[in-house]
């Protein structure tokens, strides 16, 4: 098996920089759209054979060094008692607003409530046995709670912030419950065979650094400390965290996911020997191939050949990216970083 990705997570030397892409199983791939045209997004997530098929596609098509489970961060929230739909973005019919709402939430029994996720992981481990490692994932407690409180996506997350400031006891009760659910969910993925875990805190960066420290860090730290992570590295990705990397580091992950708003070399100065993942601007993949190569080289140069670097985009790959540009990016990473 290609172990470059796992070796880099642990800061071990590798013969070339490993690369994978957030949202690498997605709409930019015609093969994905062929599968997706036959079912809804939720049906795809809940059908293990199909979810496994689209998870493997980028490994075969792009030549990436890791596969990531195809699912959605809100998958385990639905069985807490929250009806979920995608129209096209995620929408919860009854958002969390009061302590009574929080008290109604249940902690799912993962093997009974999300068996399709665990079965997808088992299929993928069999299918990927001689290829690449499998990354499991979940949303960070704060990002999950944002959707649960707002009921849908938001530009400013004002309802969530209002709860945080004006009803701190409701906020704390919700975050405790979501953290416990998240811990159960990610541990179930590890038990099923996930070889690494990525925690996505997509909205952690919308807070002031002091608010992140007070309202988010304790829960993410509790989550990471509660994972059964012997030999399973944890990647912690907080979008927009460039000004508070020292705080995010204290949550205790093994790898820091970086978006494209920070120089990778500067991030290294704050993070020390911690492994890093990133951080090409996703829109670079719309550029001509020579520009893509220049930008890949820039990111690699910022890392300055230090061990513990996984190449990735700074956020998910965009749906209209030409697949051949993503293939070219992967090829450039491998060629330019070859020892």
Swiss-Prot record:
An example Gene Ontology molecular-function term: uroporphyrinogen decarboxylase activity
A cellular component term, taken from the record's GO annotations: cytoplasm
InterPro entries linked: UROD/MetE-like_sf, Uroporphyrinogen_deCO2ase_HemE, Uroporphyrinogen_deCOase
Entries under SUPFAM superfamilies matching the protein: UROD/MetE-like
Single GO biological process annotation from the record: protoporphyrinogen IX biosynthetic process
Subunit structure: Homodimer.
Similarity annotation: Belongs to the uroporphyrinogen decarboxylase family.
Protein name: Uroporphyrinogen decarboxylase
Species per Swiss-Prot/TrEMBL record: Geotalea uraniireducens (strain Rf4)
Lineage of producing organism: Bacteria, Pseudomonadati, Thermodesulfobacteriota, Desulfuromonadia, Geobacterales
Gene: hemE
């Amino acid at each position: 098996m290609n172990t470059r990705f796992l070796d880099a997570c642990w800061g071990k030397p590798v013969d070339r920089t490993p690369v994978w892409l957030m949202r690498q199983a997605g709409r930019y791939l015609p093969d994905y759209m062929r599968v997706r045209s036959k079912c809804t997004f939720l049906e795809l997530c809940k059908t293990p054979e199909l979810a496994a098929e689209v998870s493997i596609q980028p490994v075969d098509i792009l030549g990436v060094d890791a596969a990531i489970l195809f699912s959605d961060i809100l998958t385990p929230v639905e069985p807490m008692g929250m009806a979920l739909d995608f129209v096209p973005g995620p929408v919860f019919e009854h958002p969390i607003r009061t302590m009574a709402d929080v008290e109604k939430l249940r902690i799912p029994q993962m093997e009974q409530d999300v068996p399709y996720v665990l079965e997808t992981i088992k299929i993928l481990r069999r299918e990927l046995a001689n290829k690449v490692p499998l990354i499991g994932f979940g949303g960070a407690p704060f990002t999950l709670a944002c959707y649960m409180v707002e009921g849908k996506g938001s530009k400013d997350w004002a309802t969530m912030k209002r709860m945080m400031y004006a009803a701190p006891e409701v906020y704390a009760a919700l975050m405790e419950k979501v953290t416990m659910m998240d811990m159960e969910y990610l541990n179930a993925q590890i038990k099923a065979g996930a070889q690494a875990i990525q925690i996505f805190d997509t909205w952690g960066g919308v807070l002031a650094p002091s608010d992140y420290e007070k309202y988010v860090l304790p829960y993410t730290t509790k989550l990471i400390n509660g994972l059964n992570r012997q030999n399973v590295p944890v990647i912690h990705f907080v979008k927009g965290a460039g000004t508070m990397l020292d705080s995010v580091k204290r949550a205790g992950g093994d790898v820091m996911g970086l978006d494209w708003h920070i120089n990778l070399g500067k991030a290294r100065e704050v993070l020390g020997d911690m492994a890093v993942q990133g951080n090409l601007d996703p829109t670079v993949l719309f550029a001509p191939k020579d520009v893509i190569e220049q930008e890949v080289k820039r990111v690699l140069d910022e890392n300055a050949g230090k061990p513990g670097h996984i190449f990735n985009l700074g956020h998910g790959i965009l749906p209209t990216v030409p697949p051949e540009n993503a293939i070219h990016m992967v090829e450039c990473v491998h060629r330019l970083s070859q020892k």
